[in-house]
């Protein structure tokens, strides 16, 4: 599958605009092996799991769920020293097409914990 996705991105001329991301960290390692210039991110419900796999799979970014952000000052320092973006996603967000209330994500708290970015299905909820 990874070969086909990379080939499709190359076909459309969009390879430089894509960050491949997956909960399957080994898949992102394969993407890197197939295309050393590909940007990859590791989705995870736990930041520590993502950090553990980051070096093994040469990921460019980590994508922990906001409820999995139990990290300490040393972990934040480790990530900053390596310029590894930590892009948090709110595990309480509805998926596209779902209608349910959204639990508020404490953006300031996650910034203090080391989050560098937030990605979301509902950006309008964070514009203030």
Regions found by a protein language model. Give the residues of each.
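Short loop-to-alpha-helix "cap/lid" segments that border enzyme active sites
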Residues: 1-128
């Amino acid at each position: 599958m990874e070969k086909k996705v990379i080939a499709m991105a190359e076909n459309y001329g969009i390879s430089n605009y894509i960050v491949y991301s997956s909960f399957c960290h080994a898949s992102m390692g394969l993407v890197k092996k197939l295309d050393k210039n590909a940007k990859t991110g590791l989705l995870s419900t736990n930041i520590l799991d993502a950090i553990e796999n980051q070096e093994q799979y040469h990921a460019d970014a980590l994508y922990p769920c906001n409820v999995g952000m139990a990290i300490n000052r040393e972990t934040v320092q480790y990530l900053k020293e390596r310029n590894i973006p930590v892009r948090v996603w709110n595990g309480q967000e509805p998926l596209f097409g779902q209608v349910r209330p959204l639990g508020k994500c404490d953006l300031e708290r996650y910034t203090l914990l080391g989050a560098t970015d937030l990605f979301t299905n509902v950006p309008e909820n964070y514009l203030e």
